[in-house]
């Protein structure tokens, strides 16, 4: 039977796709339905049809799944931030474990590998230490802020996101109130006019320090002192800055920073390591789970105090400084110069001297240091972006033959692809651990431990 756009189907949702969508079948025709939960019986309208599969819009939940829960957020279906709020947290964790295992099996070709139980959260809300709120206007001309609807740049008005810290709403109310009082216009992407583009808020979970950074299409905001005075009524306020971005693009932050009040950074800690965090710093957004993740990476590194370690894609030195406590020496590599400046500052802040940091691409720095300067590694740790590791880097790791490789990944598909290369001959997949860094979303972090086969 042929199905077409706008057809209405009754579906039993039997599986869950990698993006959290429900999967059902009608006469062999597979339909992917956003917001449907495994175990649901639903009515769905076909919005896109191919020969053997299509995409549907959830019209009605006829019989709810035992795993379906009422979303804690009233706009969960419109907002692009959460994909799994209608799924019980226990089932979210199972979905993420299955996703990682499936990628390692299908893409990596691995079988019968040891996988530890996923590390979830006791309280899977209010976990984000950073949020970036776009500012705009609704159809009535009212200033709004919140998050983009999925796959759009349409702002869903929401100042009280349940993933962020509770103090965010107070900040947003004060900034939007200031804009209304002093007739400050939000930035308009279509015209390139308007001033306020985004409001960034960062929060130190262990220090209760708060940073507000206004991203402007200009150099200053009207009545700056009045805004600073208002924000400083928030007890946790530590840093207020302006970031200037006058370019017509979708990049949030520009290069120019100006301090309005307080420090230019906040401080937070992971374990017993403290970090200075600026508006431009990369820092894991879930500090509670990051400590578990890095603890697992340290465990898989198997350090005794005699090892030389390379930490590739090291950011502001978060993993490097963790490793340095147990290693003889650690070398970190990161392409962003300011991140390396932060890493060096963080090493000084913690009195850690057995580290060295390099600015550059990991796939350029590591081959250069190995082939020209003869450096080696007992352990190599990689924590690449979603696209995974460069082929040149993987080949250099195979040439260097460290005893162990620890791979920290935010994308299990590219992880599986890279592991297939590393484990083709020289390395064995020893341990796999997953961490739920982003509850209510489909994202999951994975740590993998590899051992050289001849050791």
Identify the residue ranges that each predicted region occupies.
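Short, acidic/hydrophobic/Gly-rich beta-strand patch recurrent on exposed beta strands
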Residues: 22-27, 146-149, 213-215, 343
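Short, aliphatic-rich beta-strand segments
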Residues: 201, 208-217, 274-278, 379
């Amino acid at each position: 039977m042929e199905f077409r756009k706008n057809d209405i189907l009754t579906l039993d949702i039997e599986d869950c796709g990698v993006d959290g969508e429900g999967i059902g079948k009608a006469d062999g025709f597979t339909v992917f339905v956003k917001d449907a939960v495994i175990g649901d019986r639903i009515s769905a309208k076909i919005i896109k049809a191919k020969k053997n599969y299509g995409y549907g819009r959830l019209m009605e939940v006829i019989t709810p799944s035992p795993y379906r829960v009422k979303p804690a957020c009233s706009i969960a279906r419109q907002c692009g931030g959460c994909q799994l709020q209608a799924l019980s947290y226990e089932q979210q964790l199972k979905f993420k474990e299955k996703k990682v295992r499936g990628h390692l099996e299908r893409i990596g070709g691995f079988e019968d590998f040891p996988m530890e139980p996923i590390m979830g959260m006791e309280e899977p809300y209010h976990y984000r230490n950073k949020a970036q709120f776009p500012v705009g206007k609704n159809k009535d001309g009212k200033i709004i802020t919140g998050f983009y609807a999925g796959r759009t740049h349409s702002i869903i008005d929401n100042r009280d996101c349940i993933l962020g810290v509770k103090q965010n709403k107070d900040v947003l109310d004060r900034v939007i109130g200031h804009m209304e009082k002093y007739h400050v216009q939000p930035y308009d992407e279509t015209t390139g006019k308007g001033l306020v583009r985004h409001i960034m808020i960062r929060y130190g979970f262990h220090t209760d320090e708060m940073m507000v950074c206004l991203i402007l299409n200009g150099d200053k905001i009207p009545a700056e002192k009045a805004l600073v005075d208002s924000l400083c009524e928030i007890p946790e306020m530590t840093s207020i800055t302006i970031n200037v971005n006058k370019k017509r693009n979708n990049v949030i932050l520009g290069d120019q920073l100006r301090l309005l009040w307080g420090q230019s950074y906040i401080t937070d800690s992971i374990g017993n390591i403290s970090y200075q965090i600026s508006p431009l710093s990369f820092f894991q957004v879930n500090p509670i789970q990051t400590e578990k993740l890095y603890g697992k990476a340290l465990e898989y590194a198997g350090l005794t105090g005699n090892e030389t370690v390379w930490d590739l894609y090291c950011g502001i030195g978060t993993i490097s400084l963790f490793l340095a406590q147990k290693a003889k020496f650690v070398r970190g590599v990161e392409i962003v110069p300011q991140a390396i400046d932060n890493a060096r500052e963080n090493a000084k802040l913690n009195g850690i001297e057995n580290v060295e940091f390099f600015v550059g691409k990991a796939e350029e720095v590591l081959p250069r240091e190995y082939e020209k300067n003869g450096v080696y590694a007992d352990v190599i740790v990689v924590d690449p972006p979603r696209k995974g590791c460069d082929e040149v880097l993987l080949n250099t790791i195979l040439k260097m033959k460290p005893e162990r490789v620890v791979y920290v990944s935010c994308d299990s598909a590219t992880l599986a692809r890279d592991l297939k290369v590393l484990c083709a001959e020289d390395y064995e997949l020893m341990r796999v651990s997953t961490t739920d860094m982003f509850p209510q979303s489909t994202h999951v972090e994975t740590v993998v431990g590899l051992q050289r086969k001849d050791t």
